Amino acid sequence: RVDAVVVAGPSGVGKGTIIRKLMELFPQQFGFGCSHTTRGRREGEQEGVHYHFTSLDAMREAVARGEFIEHAEVHGNLYGTSVAAVGDVTKRGQVCLLDIDIQGVKTVKASPLRPKYVFIAPPSMEVLENRLRDRGTESEESLSTRLHNAREEVDYGTTE
């Protein structure tokens, strides 16, 4: 039995869309392991649905207490998946779907969790750039950072 599936890939590639579709089509089989983040909430995002939004200090303290399966700094913010988030889903008899970037994947691989991994690559870097621009949430500097990181993530995701 698989307890978790890690859906990984660059920001803007569609991980969340795939996860939502799986949960819509197979609501008894899959549940979402809602991650924590220190970044600000985007328009339309809801606490406990998209992320658990928290402060930097609170997240660092929880990490120090060993409450996270994985955590990483991504684009200047902390993100992480708590042991409790995965446990809440698996206790219901569902496979926990996790939306994790490549840094988080590396941490999960070193943890006791033994998920299956699915890597989602963009059709092209140009398409990815257009998706990120269309969101309207990125500054030019942030967009540049995300695209640089995406190239490295695609290299890792297609070779590891």
Residue ranges and their predicted role:
Residues 24-32:
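Post-Walker A helix-loop "phosphate-sensing" segment adjacent to the P-loop in P-loop NTPases
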Residues 105, 137-160:
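Small-molecule kinase domains that catalyze NTP-dependent phosphoryl transfer to phosphate-bearing small molecules
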Residues 8-10:
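P-loop (Walker A) phosphate-binding loop of NTP-binding proteins
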Residues 16:
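Walker A/P-loop
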Residues 1-5:
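Pre-Walker A (Motif I) flank of P-loop NTPase domains
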Residues 13:
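ATP-binding Walker
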Residues 96-101, 111-134:
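Conserved phosphate-donor/acceptor-positioning beta-strand/loop module used by diverse small-molecule
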Residues 35-96, 103:
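ATP-dependent small-molecule kinase phosphotransfer cores
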